C-alpha cells in the first residue's frame, strides 16, 4: 500500500512530533548535529532516544536537559554502530521503553585524518565500518519495525563530501562512505516504498568541534571556497531533521538535502 497522505492541514500540525518517538545516534556531545537534531524533535513535542558510544555522561546529560526544557521523555543508550547486534539491541530497548519508533536519525559517524596512501588500512576500514556499514546496520535493525507498523522515517546524516572531493585534506574513506550513504538512502527509499520514507542530509563544514584538529590556515582555505564565507552552526540543520522526521515530508523520499553554504554550487 502507498504511504498515506497525512491528516493534518496546518503546517504546525504537519511539523508536530507529539506522540512520536525518534532515535538519534551520535547525540552525546555538548554541541553538534546529533544533539541539535534531537533538540529540534523535542522542540516539536517529540520523545527522543539518544545514543552514545563512549560518552555516557554526555548522553545522559543531554537527555536530562531535553526532558527538563521541553517536558518530553528522553533517554540515552549505549550503541556501537559498527556492531549489528548492538543496533538490534538498541531498537529492542527503545521499543520496550517507549512502545514504538517513528523515526530514526542515523547520525553517528567518524571523520578521516588521512588518505589511502598515507594512512593505515585499519583507519580506512574503521571509517567505512562506522560511517557506511553502521548506517546499514541501523537501517536493517529498525526497518523490520517500520515494516511491521507500516510507517516510519529513516534519515541519514551524509555529507557534501559525498558529492565532491574535499580539498586540501585527504579523506578518501570519508568521502566514499558518505557517497555510499546518499545512494543508500535512494536505494532504501525504493526498497521501503510501501511503508517508510528514507532521506539524507548532506551538511557542509559545520562547527561541531570534530574539525578542531585541522590547522587554522586550512580552515581559512575552506572558508574561501564557501560562497557564504563561514562554517555553519549545527542549529541551522535542526529544521531539516524535523522536516524529514515529521508528517511535513510524507511525499518526500529518496531525497538528499545539501546544507553547505553554497560550497557544492561554487
Curated annotation (Swiss-Prot):
Homotetramer. InterPro entries: NAD(P)-bd_dom_sf, SDR_fam. It holds the Pfam family adh_short_C2. GO terms for molecular function: oxidoreductase activity, acting on NAD(P)H, oxygen as acceptor; oxidoreductase activity, acting on the CH-OH group of donors, NAD or NADP as acceptor. Its EC number is 1.1.1.138. This is NADP-dependent mannitol dehydrogenase. Disruption phenotype: Affects the ability to produce liamocins with a mannitol headgroup. The active site is at 159 (proton donor), 174 (proton acceptor), 178 (lowers pka of active site tyr). Keywords: NADP, Oxidoreductase. It is an enzyme of class 1 (oxidoreductase). It comes from the Eukaryota. NADP(+) binds at residues 107, 140, 174, 178, 206, 208. Belongs to the short-chain dehydrogenases/reductases (SDR) family. Liamocins have high bioactivity against the pathogenic bacteria Streptococcus spp. and can be potential new specific inhibitors of oral streptococcal biofilms without affecting normal oral microflora. Liamocins are also able to inhibit human cancer cell lines such as breast cancer cell lines T47D and SK-BR3 or the cervical cancer cell line HeLa. Catalyzes the interconversion between D-mannitol and D-fructose. Plays a key role in liamocins biosynthesis by providing the mannitol moity that is linked to 3,5-dihydroxydecanoic acid (provided by the HR-PKS PKS1) via ester bond formation catalyzed by the esterase EST1. It catalyses: D-mannitol + NADP(+) = D-fructose + NADPH + H(+). Induction: Expression is regulated by the cAMP-PKA and HOG1 signaling pathways via the transcriptional activator MSN2.
